[in-house]
Amino acid sequence: YPALEYAHLPLVLGPDKKRLSKRHAATSLEEYKDMGYLDSAILNSLARLGWSGGDKEVFYMDDLLKDFNIKDVQKAGAIFDITKLDWLNAQHLANLSLEGFKEHIKPFAHKIDIDINDHPNTDLLIASMRTFENTLYDIARALRPYFMDVGEYDKNAIDKFLSNGTKVLEDIHELLQTISHWNEEEIDVMLKEYQASNNLKV
């Protein structure tokens, strides 16, 4: 029989450069899936451990089959960074079609008793919230208030937090009229600038 071909892969280390363990982060891939990370983002993150694809950061399986070369994998330990996985997952989520995103968010919404179709403007709501967090689980949690029946209001809380609300809404309404390109990025920049200039807390 011909000799087997094999290669050594670098150890996966935590941010402290010690061997990755549960005290650093989850060590089971299933745990990451349960937390709302896409399979493609997890694969992307694993492939990038110890391997550089140049300036390109986001890879899918087809990209890896074409670009990955075991000879380019470094020998030194590779550091796993959860913030990088968060970023990659956000990119993969953003690249999903709206229908694809809805299919992926459904099981996470179901876990917290939400039926995403039980809303008069489901597509608009999902489209506006899909980049709000980095994982499907966190996005589902962020959607929850939109599916809750509001009971009694706390008047003291209203007086405390919404006393200036009308002016803020009027200001933002005027600023929205000045946006030249109506897209999420420009709206987000405008809101953050207004928040900073008026010392508003989220």
Segments the model singles out, each with a brief description of its role:
Residues 1-92:
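Alpha-helical recognition segments enriched in aromatics with Gly/Pro capping
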